UniProtKB/Swiss-Prot annotation:
Record: residues binding ATP: 151, 153-155
Compartments, record wording: Cytoplasm
Keywords linked to the UniProt accession: ATP-binding, Cytoplasm, DNA replication, DNA-binding, Lipid-binding, Nucleotide-binding
Region span, Domain I, interacts with DnaA modulators: 1-75
Molecular function in Gene Ontology: ATP binding; ATP hydrolysis activity; DNA replication origin binding; lipid binding
Name recorded for this polypeptide: Chromosomal replication initiator protein DnaA
Subunit organization: Oligomerizes as a right-handed, spiral filament on DNA at oriC.
CDD domains according to UniProt: AAA, Bac_DnaA_C
CC annotations in GO: cytoplasm; plasma membrane
Length: 455
C-alpha cells in the first residue's frame, strides 16, 4: 500500500474514534485525502458531493483540524493545521449504456403534468420544490422526498417532474418500489445484474414511487443503497415518494433513513375546500363531464377522502344520469353518492385513533400516551380525545385511563380546545390534520373490514 493510502487510513481511523458509527459510515468514511493539494499547514480532502462537503465542514471541520494538529499521521504538518474539503472531480464514464429511457416499462405517464396539477395552500410548497427540481440542470436538493396520505397527488407530481425532464431530453427512470423489486429479482435470477445496474444508475432523474415498500427486504435495500450512492455521487437527481416520513418507515435500514433525509422532505397535506372545488372542476373538464355548480360544490364538501374518490364520484354521477336518462341535479347527486358519504371512521377503536393521529403527526403511539409539554404531543393527545368522542362509545373514564389522565375533567377541556380550533379559529393546520386523520382512520377501518370478511 502506498504512503498516501496509509495516511488516509490513519486519518479515517482517528475520525472513527471520535464520531458516532452512523455518522462515520454514512458521511465521514467517504472523505478522500488529497496529497497533491495538501501543504505543511493545510490538509485537503475530497467529499463526493457538495452536500457532504458543506455538512462535514460545518459539523466536523473543527474536529478534523484538532485531530490533524494533534496527530502527525505520516504527514509533515505544522503544529496548527487548517482543513479544506472540496467536491471530488467527476469521474468520466467511458461507455454509457444504450438504453431507451422513454421505453422503460415503468415509464412516465404523459397525462400528469405541472400544467394540470391543481395548486392550493395544501401542496404549494411541494409544487414549488418539484418545479425547481425539474427545471434545474444540477440537483438543488438531493434527494427530494414527498410524503403524505393516499390520493393526495404525490404520484401526479412525481410524473410531472419526469415529463418536464423528458422535455429537456434528460434520461428518466420512474418506477414503483414493487416494480423495482420485480426487476431486481428477474435480473438476479438471470445473472444479469450488470444490465440492472446500468438501467437504474446511468440516468439523470431517478424517480421512485412507494418508497416505503423497500423496507423489510434486505437484499433489495442493499442494492438500492448502492444505487442511491452512485446516483448521488454523480449528482443525478433522486426523487422519492412515500406515504410516511423516513423516520416512520418501520423496518427500513437506518442508513437508508439517513440518506432519505440528506436533501429535503415535504409533506403533501389534504386539500382544503377551495382546492377540492378546483380539483372537482378540473376533473370534470378532463373527463368531459358537465355538472351544475351546486353539484360540484356538494362533491367538494362531502367527498373528503382523497382526489381519486372525488373523480370516482364525478364519474358515478354521470354514469347513473345516463343510465336513468335523468338530468344531473343535487337530488340525483345525493342519492347516487349516499354510500360514499357514510363516514367509515364511525366505530373506530381507540387503538386505531391513536395510530392515525400518531402517523399524521410523525409521532410514536407510545409518545402520545404519556403527558408531555411538547406542543406536538399535547396537540396529538387533544386530537385523540376529539376523535374518540366523535367515533367511539368509550366513556370518559376509560378514555382518561387510556391517556393516563388523573383528572377526568381534562377530557372535556381537551375536546373543547380542538373544537374551538376547528370551528372558531378555523386553524388551517388543524383543519387539514382533521382531514388527514379521518383518511387514515378510514384506511385502517377498511383494512379491518377486509380482514374480517376474508375469515
Amino acid at each position: 500500500m502506498d504512503t498516501n493510502n496509509n495516511i488516509e487510513k490513519e486519518i479515517l481511523a482517528l475520525i472513527k474514534q471520535k464520531v458516532s458509527p452512523i455518522e462515520y459510515e454514512n458521511c465521514l468514511s467517504q472523505l478522500k485525502y488529497n496529497p497533491n493539494a495538501s501543504k505543511s499547514d493545510i490538509a485537503f480532502f475530497y467529499a463526493p458531493n457538495m452536500l457532504l462537503c458543506n455538512w462535514i465542514t460545518a459539523k466536523h471541520g473543527a474536529l478534523l483540524k484538532e485531530i490533524l494538529s494533534q496527530n502527525k499521521v505520516g504527514m509533515h504538518l505544522a503544529h496548527s493545521v487548517d482543513v479544506r474539503i472540496e467536491v471530488a472531480p467527476k469521474i468520466q464514464i467511458s461507455a454509457q449504456p444504450n438504453i431507451n429511457y422513454k421505453a422503460v416499462k415503468t415509464s412516465v405517464k404523459d397525462s400528469y403534468t405541472f400544467e394540470n396539477f391543481v395548486v392550493g395552500s395544501c401542496n404549494n410548497t411541494v409544487y414549488e420544490i418539484a418545479k425547481k427540481v425539474a427545471q434545474s440542470d444540477t440537483p438543488p436538493y438531493n434527494p427530494v422526498l414527498f410524503y403524505g396520505g393516499t390520493g393526495l397527488g404525490k404520484t401526479h407530481i412525481l410524473n410531472a417532474i419526469g415529463n418536464h425532464a423528458l422535455e429537456k431530453h434528460k434520461k428518466v427512470v420512474l418506477v414503483t418500489s414493487e416494480d423495482f423489486l420485480t426487476d431486481f429479482l428477474k435480473h438476479l435470477d438471470n445473472q444479469t445484474m450488470d444490465s440492472f445496474k446500468k438501467k437504474y444508475r446511468h440516468c439523470d432523474f431517478f424517480l421512485l414511487d412507494d418508497a416505503q415498500f423497500l423496507q423489510g427486504k434486505p437484499k433489495l435495500e442493499e442494492e438500492f443503497f448502492h444505487t442511491f450512492n452512485e446516483l448521488h455521487a454523480n449528482s443525478k437527481q433522486i426523487v422519492l415518494i412515500s406515504d410516511r416520513s423516513p423516520k416512520n418507515i418501520a423496518g427500513l435500514e437506518d442508513r437508508l433513513k439517513s440518506r432519505f433525509e440528506w436533501g429535503i422532505t415535504a409533506k403533501v397535506m389534504p386539500p382544503d375546500l377551495e382546492t377540492k372545488l378546483s380539483i372537482v372542476k378540473q376533473k370534470c373538464q378532463l373527463n368531459k363531464i358537465t355538472l351544475p355548480e351546486e353539484v360540484m360544490e356538494y362533491i367538494a364538501q362531502h367527498i373528503s377522502d382523497n382526489i381519486r374518490q372525488m373523480e370516482g364520484a364525478i364519474i358515478k354521477i354521470s354514469v347513473n344520469a345516463n343510465l336513468m336518462n335523468a338530468p344531473i341535479d343535487l337530488n340525483l347527486a345525493k342519492t347516487v353518492l349516499e354510500d360514499l358519504q357514510k363516514d367509515h371512521a364511525e366505530g373506530s377503536s381507540l387503538e386505531n385513533i391513536l395510530l392515525a393521529v400518531a402517523q399524521s403527526l410523525n409521532l410514536k403511539s407510545s409518545e402520545i400516551k404519556i403527558s408531555s409539554r411538547q406542543k406536538n404531543v399535547a396537540l396529538a393527545r387533544k386530537l385523540v380525545v376529539y376523535f374518540a368522542r366523535l367515533y367511539t362509545p368509550n366513556p370518559t373514564l376509560s378514555l382518561a385511563q387510556f391517556l393516563d389522565l388523573k383528572d377526568h375533567s381534562s377530557i372535556s377541556k381537551m375536546y373543547s380546545s380542538v373544537k374551538k380550533m376547528l370551528e372558531e379559529e378555523k386553524s388551517p393546520f388543524v383543519l387539514s390534520l382533521r382531514e388527514e386523520i379521518k383518511n387514515r382512520l378510514n384506511e385502517l377501518n377498511d383494512k379491518k373490514t377486509a380482514f374480517h370478511s376474508s375469515e
